[in-house]
Amino acid sequence: MSDESPATLRRIAEEGARLAGRVLAERFQGERTIEYKGGIDLVTDADRAAEAAVLGFIRQHYPGHAILAEESGASKGSGLRWIVDPLDGTTNYAHRVPHFCVSVGVEGPDGVLAGAIYAPMMDELFSAARGEGATLNGRPMRVSGTTELGHSLLCTGFPYDVHERPEGPVGLLKRFIVRAQGMRRTGSAALDLAYVAAGRFDGFFEFGLKPWDVAAGSLLVQEAGGTMVRIDGAPFQVGIGDVLACAPGLASQLISESRGFLADIGWVPPAPRA
């Protein structure tokens, strides 16, 4: 396939995400093999099966494109790069908590061009193409109009090294939990970003994310009219692991609070990941 327009890339991302989502849904109640990649970082046989399904589909349409996937790593190619998380929310999935998703994004030299996030247990497909807006199951979606931090519902997550380095994620959680209306921790960063884009959450922040966690979701937020930045307010790029996404009416308040906290702990921006 030679068509690399954002609209076509979006359609391929959507179809690939749905394909992987069906694999996950079919295996959800069955037996599964669970392995530990780190202290609290899991991988299941369903992750690998879903990844094989979506990568095979992408390669059918764009055999020359590069791919970065959570389980199989990077494969070189020319032109665009697909960034795939076949199962975001693996711990939820392993415990049969039905809150997880597939995330498929594709980026060019100037950033993400298209992306899709599919939550199979709810049959919700969030997608976006650059310059064409964001949708939920085909209907346009927008970030919330919330402008007061005290009226906001925020969400966050914890990186896999939170046991060794809790000061950032736990400290910022403490700072916001007493200022927001409510706080949630769902276990899927990609879905958290999709929920910000859909106006369900007013803001999201997290440390230590990988490109496959944020590629598709960042475009959803931006195309839905939201703010997507590094956690200190600097410009966002896919390789940045410490991020903040929110409704535009909350951006200055959240960034100000975040900067104050980061200064207190002596935070140093990590180098962007490839």
PLM ranges: what are they?
Residues 1-11, 15, 171-178, 191-274:
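Oxyanion/phosphate-interacting regions
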Residues 78-122:
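Glycine-rich active-site/cofactor-binding loop and its immediate structural neighborhood
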Residues 20, 24, 47, 58, ...:
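Residue-level signal for inorganic ion chemistry
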Residues 1-87, 249, 265-274:
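N-terminal subdomain of lithium-sensitive/metallo-dependent phosphomonoesterases centered on the IMPase/IPPase/PAP
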Residues 105-193, 240-274:
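Acidic beta-strand-loop-alpha-helix segment within the catalytic core
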Residues 23, 64-66, 140, 182, ...:
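Residue-level detector of anion-binding/catalytic polar loops
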Residues 29, 100, 128-132, 222, ...:
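A short, compositionally biased
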Residues 37, 70, 186-188, 231:
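Conserved beta-strand termini and adjacent loop/short-helix elements that scaffold enzyme active sites
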